[in-house]
Amino acid sequence: MARLSIAVIFAAASVLLSVTARACPALIEGVPPDRLKALSQGVNADGWIADPRSAPPRSLLRELRKAGLSHIRLPVPADFVMPRFAAKAEIDGRLRSVDAALKTLLELGYSVSIDLHSGERFNALHKDDPPGAMAEMKSAWTGLARVMQRHPYDRVFAELLNEPDVDAAQWQNEVRELAGFIRGLLPQTTLITGPVNWQRADSLPDFTPLDDPNVVYAIHFYDPMVFTHQAHWDPNEPLHDVSGLPYPIRADDPRVQQLREQLTALGKPKTLAMVDRAIPDRGIDQWLEPAAAWQRQYSHPIIINEFGVLKAGAPRDSRLRWLAGVTAYARQQCWGWTHWEMSQGFGLADAVTGKPDREALRALLGTR
């Protein structure tokens, strides 16, 4: 099959979006415009703090900055900076890694969001002992705030907790307390937070914004999952058996028909049902409309802080088309976006050369 040109992919992305161009929604005053601009296009640097040896090369960071990315989301594994799960010496070492990463990124001209990234041990504590979890979050943010206070407050932002894995009512109560605590430590810092349930767009309508005006609200987007997570790394996951599924997903596409036949022959009814549920695809604008409606109601800024497609099984032209569609929609809504992620399975860097994938960058940035 001939490779589609990037121009064709951009044109297809425009067709996939059923919304028409519109003016940016009016927002309440609170987050300075220069910070919203800094958050407008970025990438996650996953793994850097978990293993500083895996830090992205400075040359890659420089190239991405030159291409136009302005924001790095820096996940900090919660289990590594909480005294319930880590000794003081380990916590101090992780905080030094955060400080070093901030120095590097700020020198290169990025703005950075520090993301307290929940893990299995913290998630279990969060469900079983909410007061204990709150104490750990406050301890983690006390340490992180000490690091952040060494750097410009208008370029380093605080993301309260990635993908809270508790029910909506619990998190709604906790987020007010946690945000107030962090605001006491970082009076001028922009905060970032979002809803439960993987921070899906359709979970945002059940989330009440904070009284604090200097907050950006983050959603994550991976729909349809059967496309974005095909060839899943876990062999026990049904999506492990999906590969070559195109986007958009149409019943009359020969590739979809062939995949359905393969899954039937393999005796994979659960996986087959996941493919069938994605036919016909709803379209990016329809998946994200609940978040747009929430913004129209509350007038707060939104960022798509994670989105991406696993490269292992997705057709390249479809991956580029999906990425272009997501960021085109974000631009129409005047939302920021942060691609997941830089150098791993969803990565923006080429696995062989370690250099930026130029076509993926053009798809994200909407340039030719």
Task: Label each region the model flagged.
Residues 23-73, 88, 294:
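N-terminal carbohydrate-binding accessory modules
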Residues 26, 135-278, 285, 289-309, ...:
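Active-site region of glycoside hydrolase catalytic domains
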Residues 31-37, 59-68, 100-107, 145-153, ...:
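Acidic (Asp/Glu)-rich catalytic clusters
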Residues 44-46, 73-77, 113-117, 159-161, ...:
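A cross-family glycoside hydrolase active-site/sugar-binding cleft signature
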Residues 48-56, 79-93, 135, 164-169, ...:
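Acidic-and-aromatic substrate-binding clefts and catalytic sites of carbohydrate-active enzymes
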Residues 53-56, 61-70, 76, 90-116, ...:
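An active-site-proximal structural segment forming one wall of the substrate-binding cleft
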